[in-house]
Regions:
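Short, flexible, mixed-charge glycine/proline-rich loop motifs
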Residues: 60-62, 92-102, 137-142
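Short Cys/His-centered divalent metal-binding micro-motifs
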Residues: 146-155
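N-terminal start-of-chain detector that recognizes signal peptides
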Residues: 78, 97-100, 118-122
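Histidine-centered nuclease catalytic patch
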Residues: 111-145
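Cys/His-rich metal-chelating microdomains
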Residues: 109-112, 152-153
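N-terminal accessory alpha/beta regions
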Residues: 1-94
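A broad, low-specificity signal for short, low-complexity segments enriched in glycine/proline
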Residues: 69, 105-110
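The −1 position to Zn-ligating cysteines in a subset of zinc-ribbon hairpins
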Residues: 105, 126, 149
Length: 155
């Protein structure tokens, strides 16, 4: 994977985090995973978590919930909510982030051109997650967990 160098990356991350936090509404307090993420932990810290600390967030979550039942309604509702929030963010916020990054080539293959949006400012870009959003839904919105890439990587 090619290294992405951008002198404004921390400011871009802050802007992204601020935009995501504004969208945080209608949280179900009766879901223990959402309650942990939004009330016990600082959600902003997870969204803006630097790459070197993502594994620490995973360890914290696993320590808080050592015996997750991945078939239980609580977990399924949490996963559905977080992936839904990611899709909303992808459609509404990520265009500006991509525009700020000035990234034109897939960081995986360094050959395919990647585009942020179509003419209607709708995000057409593909994103991969370093830590899978299906296994780690609490990292689905983490700025440094998102990898802007070409469609070949996704498929």
């Amino acid at each position: 994977m090619i290294e992405i160098k951008n002198s404004n990356i921390q400011q871009i991350s802050r802007n992204y985090t601020d935009s995501v936090i504004i969208m945080k509404r209608n949280i179900k307090r009766n879901n223990k995973y959402l309650a942990y993420l939004f009330y016990k932990r600082k959600f902003e810290d997870i969204v803006s978590c630097p790459p070197s600390s993502l594994i620490i967030e995973i360890e914290r979550f696993n320590k808080q919930f050592p015996d997750i039942d991945y078939e239980a309604r609580d977990w399924c509702d949490f996963k559905k909510y977080m992936i839904g929030q990611y899709e909303k963010v992808r459609k509404e916020i990520l265009y500006d982030v991509l525009d700020s990054l000035n990234l034109n080539v897939c960081p995986y293959c360094n050959r395919q051109y990647i585009f942020g949006a179509d003419n209607n400012r709708k995000v057409a870009a593909q994103f991969d997650h370093f830590y899978s959003k299906s296994k780690y839904p609490y990292l689905a919105l983490s700025f440094y967990n998102l990898i802007h890439c070409c469609p070949k990587k996704i498929s």
